């Protein structure tokens, strides 16, 4: 009888031991399955891969330093607009940016007889390829950034009553850096806020007046820093 009790006890312990092992194995398998699931926002197969964008806002040129042969610039603030596209391969990608700054001021010109009002309009056009990156914060929020190097074109136009129109241009290489935040409204549209910088220096102006060009060639010996900061709001339209 005693041996039977001992055998029964051993059998019961064996059953409980096997049951405990099965439970432990099940828990371990469940843990592995949970850990193998991609974290929310990192499953790139579920993320869009490309969009076109457009935005507008304000630009600010902090440098108004005087350069030998050229008066200090009065173009401090103006309208900034930007359009382009971005194509991603998981986190990183590439894109193209077209951005322009426009500022207008009215100045008085005195020819020795009378004072005349003139409109002085300055434009800075920038076109560049970009290297881009993005960081998914959730289902709707994404932080992104871009850095590029491209072509910078400056154009200044002066218009005055009785004076006609006079334009000057200068070309240079420049760089850009952008950081932005996007809020997804749907699978197709997102709203964005961008902060950034476009940097470069312009050289000697080319004007459409022979006499004035000769004077510029003689007196203009430096470069002007046209680096600007900007803030824009816009939209992303997902097409891929």
Indicate residue ranges for each PLM-predicted region.
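Bacterial Sec-dependent N-terminal signal peptides
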Residues: 1-25
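Short glycine/proline- and aromatic-enriched beta-strand/turn motifs that initiate or cap beta-hairpins
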Residues: 21-94, 230-240
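Intrinsically disordered, low-complexity serine/threonine-rich segments
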Residues: 14, 19-20, 56, 60, ...
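A contiguous pocket-lining binding segment that forms or flanks enzyme active sites
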Residues: 164-184
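Hydrophobic alpha-helical segments of small multi-pass membrane proteins
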Residues: 129, 147-149, 172-179, 197
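Gram-negative (and chloroplast) outer-membrane scaffold detector with strong preference
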Residues: 83-161, 183-185, 189, 226-240
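Flexible, solvent-exposed loop segments that connect beta-strands
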Residues: 60-75, 99-124, 151-171, 203-224
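Predominantly the C-terminal beta-signal and adjacent terminal strand-loop region
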Residues: 103, 177, 182-240
């Amino acid at each position: 009888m005693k041996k039977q009790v001992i055998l029964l006890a051993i059998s019961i312990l064996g059953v409980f031991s096997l049951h405990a092992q099965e439970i432990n194995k099940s828990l371990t398998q469940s843990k592995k399955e949970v850990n193998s699931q991609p974290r929310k926002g990192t499953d790139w197969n579920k993320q869009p891969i490309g969009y076109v964008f457009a935005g507008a806002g304000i630009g600010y040129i902090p440098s108004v330093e005087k350069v030998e042969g050229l008066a200090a610039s009065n173009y401090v603030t103006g309208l900034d607009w930007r359009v382009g596209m971005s194509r991603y391969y998981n986190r990183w990608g590439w894109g193209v940016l077209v951005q322009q700054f426009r500022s207008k001021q009215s100045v008085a010109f005195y020819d020795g007889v009378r004072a005349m009002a003139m409109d002085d309009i300055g434009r800075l056009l920038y076109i560049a390829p970009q290297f881009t990156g993005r960081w998914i914060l959730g289902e709707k929020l994404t932080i992104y950034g871009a850095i590029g190097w491209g072509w910078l074109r400056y154009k200044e136009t002066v218009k005055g009553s009785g004076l006609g129109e006079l334009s000057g241009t200068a070309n240079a290489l420049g760089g850009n850096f952008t950081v932005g935040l996007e809020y997804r409204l749907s699978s197709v549209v997102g709203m964005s806020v961008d902060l950034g910088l476009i940097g470069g220096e312009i050289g000697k102006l080319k004007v459409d007046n022979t006499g004035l060009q000769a004077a510029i060639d003689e007196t203009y010996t430096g470069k002007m820093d046209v680096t600007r900061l900007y803030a824009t709001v816009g939209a992303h339209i997902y097409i891929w």
